[in-house]
């Protein structure tokens, strides 16, 4: 290259002097002092001590020794080396002539390099370039061959070539220095030696740095010049490929510009640089390719030459060091080639800390836990196998691992449930749908779109900020405007909660009901009674009743069965020997019928005629006719097995087949067998009377003919997708048509009823001059004063529209109803064995239900029934009768009740329709788990207490255990909160705000404790409705919780159970919850995912749970229920300890102890099983003995003496005929 005057050190990256300054970029200024210093070779001086002679002597000895060894063995060498050796021989003369002319080199005059032009680009001809490439290809095709050529000759020849190379290298360095100066001074001459073989020192100038490389050549530099500031002990390998040294001129020009900088940043070699398939241009500064010798090149050009032996030796050492560096490099970096090697310690330390933080962030908590678990498992396996021994014990145990409890799971089944005893005759579960793919079934599953839309709007309206209200704002506070609290009706004057106020009907039923229909207005009560179909067959009916203990009475709806039968029996003298009881499936029905009968008899409600429902007993000592729900009669049978207070019992609306009705059938059948004086009358509206008759032993069936008024039934032409919308349209059409008479709409549930009522009112408001309509909803949760409204007469000129559940199907006689709109759906309680709970779901009604509903329209005049489903759906998609409740609900409470009534063998109990085997076994297993049944299936003392609570058995158990643990006050609140469906609501548009407020109540260990916290906060805020609305809590639900709590507290007081508080020690509360729900326990698996310990079923924390996202994931939890949505979500979760599970649920869990072997555990399990077998054998013997005793006694007649007179009966000391003939004796 030509000289150029500009300083080579200008704008160049310098290495950092570690001792003097901190790392950074340095721009040197132009000055004479900043010229790069060039070290000149010192003049050769002979050693004073003669060390140079000694060194040459040693070298000669080593060479002779090497010659001796090499003669003894042949060598395997490559074809390339053989070619090199031939070249070496050919070039031997060149070396001698070179050495001879070295002294006169200064006097020689070399031809100056020719300037490159586009027509004369320099370099060799294209023909030579092609020949060279051909030779290269041939050489690569050859393999490896054996050669015994003398190694010593080759070594000598090679070293001579290396001396030549080194000499030329030094010359070129000098030239490059001069050319650099000349370029800076403005000279534009190019070197004509571009295509000559380049020395190892010269090559790195072509290596691209990130600042200079093109996109193609990025990151391809390898080493730097040895004379740069970043000094490297290993030289960069030489690239002497003919392919590399003969580039097209444009590329060469580009490289010449880049190569003026002698110092390049060393870069790591990416892995792709080594590959065969990589682009050849990428070999710019990367891994060296195959070297083809150091002597004279094949094309005759001069190779590397060395001036002295020291230079040759130095060059060989450099090559060896380069190889060593290369193989010892880690990812292309080492201490010499690392551009950050000489950075300041402070910078390095900060960078390392930053990288360490990043590394910690990158690994997820889940991954870290998996790694730890794997490591522990591997260590454990190695220690167990005995391959290794632990030398050091880590005494600094992690806190969580020290406290971790491992549970072993057993599946213990008591002998009475292991299959040897059969409890039911119905093996398969019963599904309450005829065809799950039918239109009605699909629409029932989807629900109403109108209801969904209405719910969202209501929540949005409730949650929106009422900015127009001054109360609660700063301006309102200044003006003295305060928020008005809704008056709380359930609070008495002394501030206590009276939960019975909303459930009492007697106060609202005092007023005499006024007639609304023309029929009722024109006729007196006596005339109305005589008009009923039952009046025509009164005497026949009484005769059959007199002759038979059990009678089935079948009559269509409106025939007068419910109201007249009790009065006829009373008039016939049955009330002289005891009360006449009449059971109804629902509370409203019992209350309304009692009111009607009391009016017909001309007395006040609660005197001669009274009713008894849950929370309210409207009877007195003078009561002769008592209407009640079937649950009340069932409770009375607990206290008095033979029902001695009653002379006759009427089981009304038996076709409803409620759970309590079916149990009563079985019980009363036994009671009638024991009491020959008791009369049992079963009434039904449907024609399925043969089933009842055969159940009671082929008893007579009495039919009451005819219905009072005809009913016209109209079906829908097409299936209705949205039953609420269709019902609203139909009701408005009927109302606006102007025909007289009230409307009754049947809807599945409370929400549907409320939405339908609102929609009708909204649509009427949109119409001008629409006739007045009073919309009255009725469902079981409605306060009694509103329920009583439907029986009161509407103002003149106002039509009534009653929207009801199937509560209005039976016994509910509302005067004046002419139009019935039947949606075709109802809500049924169905047991889900998977979660072990009952759920209310919408299902299509049965044909029997449909007939009952249409019958409502013909009570007081001719009517119409609009069915919102097609005639084919009625025939093909509806079941004939409803599936009995006993076949679709949880039987735990029924089993408890039957056991408490003394029924030992459930297979012997007479069910009209036996419950499915799965349901029965599930219920009994659950009761055994909770300790209500012992190992033989007998009732325990805990079970006897559980019967008294109208709760799920698990909740009853929780209450009972809480008295022993001393936290009954807190558990009472939690149980009350769990018995109410939803406490919080999330309005659309304010979900995040709602969630944030909800989080304030969260107790991180338990959702149950969060509920407790909510109630206590509400109590501290004086049961405020405003507080509830501010915190997105249903105020109505909280009031319901307070009522349930008061009711349960009364039962606890009756049972003499202590009410105590544990204060702030809520761990006891968690343990108490664990005692009731240990069978629904789950253990941690991964992050946020749990699996049921017993079944292995995956369970996930619900996002609304207090434990979700709290950063606290306990190893063991128990949950209240499992809800299936997109995942299996647990609802109401509480963290528990592993020891609690083992202590409270020993039939499932035991703590894994290191000392105990598997054999010991197996032996213990065998002992437990044999102990249970002995108990079972003893129980079977006792049961056998009890049966034999019963067989010895006479099964006929009553055990006790009867006091009721019957025709033909003779008392001792009396004449054969009674003193007087009864007034109504005979036909």
Curated annotation (Swiss-Prot):
There is a cross-link at residues 482-483, 504, 1166 (Glycyl lysine isopeptide (Lys-Gly) (interchain with G-Cter in SUMO2)). It is found in: Nucleus. Its EC number is 3.6.4.13. Residues 1-22, 59-320, 1155-1227 are annotated as: Disordered. It catalyses: ATP + H2O = ADP + phosphate + H(+). GO terms for cellular component: catalytic step 2 spliceosome; spliceosomal complex. Residues 59-92, 128-201, 240-263, 311-320, 1157-1169, 1181-1194 have a biased composition (Basic and acidic residues). ATP binds at residues 555-562. GO terms for molecular function: 3'-5' RNA helicase activity; ATP binding; ATP hydrolysis activity; RNA binding. The keyword Cytoplasm does not apply. One of its GO terms (biological process) is mRNA splicing, via spliceosome. Transmembrane segments: none annotated. Residues 300-310 have a biased composition (Acidic residues). Belongs to the DEAD box helicase family. DEAH subfamily. PRP16 sub-subfamily. This is Pre-mRNA-splicing factor ATP-dependent RNA helicase PRP16. It comes from Bos taurus.
